[in-house]
Amino acid sequence: PMFHCNGWCYPWTLAMLHARVICIRNIRAKEIFDLITEHKVTHFGGAPIILNMLVSAPKEEQKPLKHKVYVLTAAAPPPSIIFKKMKNLGFEVMHVYGLTETYGHILQCAWNKEWDDLNEDEKADISARQGVRYPNLEDVDVMDSETMKVVPRDGKTIGEIMIRGNVV
């Protein structure tokens, strides 16, 4: 979607790369599969609800992909089952995090080679996490908003995402 933070970044990058951009007015699974096949789409962005629509579409609407399609998804992390089902359809999904106030995505769950040996459920769970910062961001951490101390990286302690850089 080319609105809020995406509208400020992607169109310019895509134009710079001479990429073909396909915009659709009505979001329907059949149309998405048809366009991916017809135009050999390699990358697309969609919210978790779009990914859910694709994996839940009737089998006759789901076209087998002859090539890998890389997907960026943002908003709330998709359930791990969505990552597994998308992979089974031929999509490689990366969850990213960003804000309108940061000119787009600033964190990505970049795959780590040491995760290759995990089982499919563990891989899907890890894929929903946030990971490393994009190079355009100076610093990011999760902190206690009252003490301004970094919280433990234990997957349990709640904190606020603190962002610093010239894109904020």
Role assignments for model-derived ranges:
Residues 2-3, 30, 34-38, 48-69, ...:
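Adenylate-forming
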Residues 19, 37, 69-71, 78-96, ...:
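Conserved AMP-binding/adenylate-forming
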Residues 3-42, 57, 139:
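Conserved AMP-binding/adenylation subdomain of ANL enzymes
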